[in-house]
Amino acid sequence: MMNRWSALFKGDRVLWILIGLLMLSSLPLIYSSTGQLALRKYDGDTERSLLAHGFKLLLGGVIMLFAHRIPYLWLGRLSAWGVYIGCAILAVTLVYGQTINSASRSLVIPFTNISFQGSDPARFFLILWLARGLALLQKDERIRRFRDGWMHLLGGLMVTAVLIAPENLSTALMLLGVGIGMIWVAGARLVDLTKVVVGGLLVVFLLVTVAYLAGWPRARVWKNRMESYLSPTPGQEDFQVLQAKIAVSDGGLWGKGPGKSIQRNFLPHAYSDFIYAIVIEEYGIAGAAWVLLLYLGLFYRIRKIAMNARSPYGAYIASGMGMALMAQAVVNMLVSVSAMPVTGQTLPFISHGGSSILINALAMGVILSVSRDMTGEGDWSELDIEGESQTNKGGDAVPSKGEVSYA
């Protein structure tokens, strides 16, 4: 029986277990927190909300199984096309996207009722593209140089962020942070990175100020969220923040118990943006610590995979995907406990959602593919960064490092 499971779930088994625990932990939370959603979409049938969420988790699991069996080095040749596809999706979303909560973030697939956030696939494709570019720069020993080194990667990162920012500033800033983090991990000089970060912050501040003075609606939303965070008052703009604070303060050490949340009936988006507040209300500090430890464990395993990857490309993929997932989780938790302004970020594998679950599952599948190569369960040592056999090019195959233990 164990051999069957081992044959099905290859790579880092601890990573598989942690992802599974996050998914299982989400089920009672979604069932409890989707009352408002069920009233709007399912005539009050919360079981349908739970089944819909469970189906997305199951589909995410299938995607992980499929993705972790694909040699991650094959993704190198697809990454250039992928980043163009991601930017095209973002551009179409800006023009034809479905407006939700005063922001055009979702794109509806024609002839279906299925929608997805364009920033999710764009982020995935961009990280693959950055990882490939950084691996090639390291190979040519140009990662320490800016102008004839990683400047073009910064350009692609900025273009993607600019396309995301008008409707989702927090995601754009997080993506910029992940991209800069990947460049730093690859070995870029700290002085160059510091100049880029300082200059970027000044540009963002200038653009947001100009947008607000020009009367752009989204800029007003950003301003209102900052004001709500800095000086909350019992008004409509601060309703979410105040309700989340009540949920957190009522949780105590052990919480009210599963399904006994009161604030879920008043807190908008209790099943997505503020689900961590429901975790604290129902399961207390103990439940909040459990969820946090799962994410920390996930990040620790991904970090070990990145450090022991058998190619720079695999290391940068794992680093980028891991940073992106952890940043999303941390931001959601900080917002839920009123430690930062409202952003609209969901909690990976726990919040109710479609594209976020599926893209994060795909990202974890790719990381598991990297770990599968490390354990010797994927014999990809003869592939180069483009997924082509180096033996077929007339050279000797890359020597295998053997099985790597990272338990």
Regions found by a protein language model. Name each.
Residues 91, 180-181, 326, 364:
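Hydrophobic residues within the alpha-helical transmembrane core of Major Facilitator Superfamily
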Residues 55-60, 282-299:
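Hydrophobic alpha-helical transmembrane segments
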